[in-house]
Amino acid sequence: MELSFRRNGRLWLLLLGVTLGARSAWSVEETDYERHFQELVSPFMDSAKGGSLLGSDGNTLTYHVFRRRESRPAVLILTGYAESWLTYGETALDLDQAGYDVYVMDHRGMGFSGRLAHDPRIAHIPEFQVYVDDARTFLHQVVLPQVRGPLFLLAHSMGGLVGAYLLEKEARHFRAAAFSAPLFELNTGMVPEFLALGVVNLQVAIGRGAQFAPGRGDFDPTKVDPSQCSTTHSVARCRHQLDLYQRVPETFIAGPSNQWVKEVIHATHRLPDLVSSFKALPILILQAEDDAFVRSGSQSKVCAALTHCELIMLPHTFHEILQEKDPARNAAMRAILRLFHEHQMG
């Protein structure tokens, strides 16, 4: 008797969930992390096909594609603030081994894409919409022409904010979207947001828009103790990222500009108006319990406004969920893949 995959999809997903849940780790375990990374992840990253395209203003955007065959489902990754595609080698390998092609682009002013400030260490944009326009350009010029199977979105931090704006216009192209610690509200620390916005508005008004925002710009990765990392509890993964800044200094970002802070805050304020445009899309939001960079309240509000949204708070996690210690990271990857697998059939 021939079985229909579609009719028996739930059983298959159940079996898959048991298999995923039984795994103790994914591509790389923290134990002897660097050796495993060099043996497993580095060769995989070498297999990526790199390319570049021009943004709407002629700025160069770099991207990388991990593709095995036309019929596979695919994941578009939108990276976080100050990140490059190099940060996502481990995650890309996990997705590849789970059966997905991966497309990842460096945001303008970050990674290997063109810089917009006089100082290449400054994350700067004239307006937030350029991030969204770049993502749409990447989607239409690179991703959609190649993908023949279902397409999914995985967006982290600032990429989550860009992703929400992308979905406003392009939700029809995606089966589901997973957000990791999305920047739906900037954490301005002890300074109230309205006051922080007032300060950067003043800086922009006096012609300092492309300069470091107050209190930013003094980040030195050589002085960070991996055991005291504020982005992840994983000493091994923190050390790897810090070493990456030294090995590939052109990807290093020391801080955001005044204009960047202004644009991001304004973009978060417009989020409630966007939700209705992708309200029916299956959404997963992974929330870090101890996030020092974004506030979780707006993540919960966005999820509550969506029809099919699951919010998972991961205990004992800092902002970089996909760079966390194995137990938390494995839980995050299981949740992401469960979402993607469940919606492959449409």
Language-model segments: residues:
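Short alpha-helix in the alpha/beta-hydrolase fold that links the catalytic acid
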Residues: 281, 295-304
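Conserved alpha/beta-hydrolase
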Residues: 92-118
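Active-site glycine-rich loops that stabilize anionic/oxyanionic intermediates
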Residues: 72, 80-83, 158
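Catalytic active-site module of serine/aspartate enzymes centered on a nucleophile-bearing elbow/loop
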Residues: 310, 315-346
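Alpha/beta-hydrolase-fold enzymes
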Residues: 162-252
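Alpha/beta-hydrolase active-site loop
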Residues: 123-143
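Short beta-strand/loop motif that positions the catalytic acidic residue
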Residues: 279, 285-287, 291
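An N-terminal hydrophobic leader/cap segment in hydrolases
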Residues: 15-54, 61-64
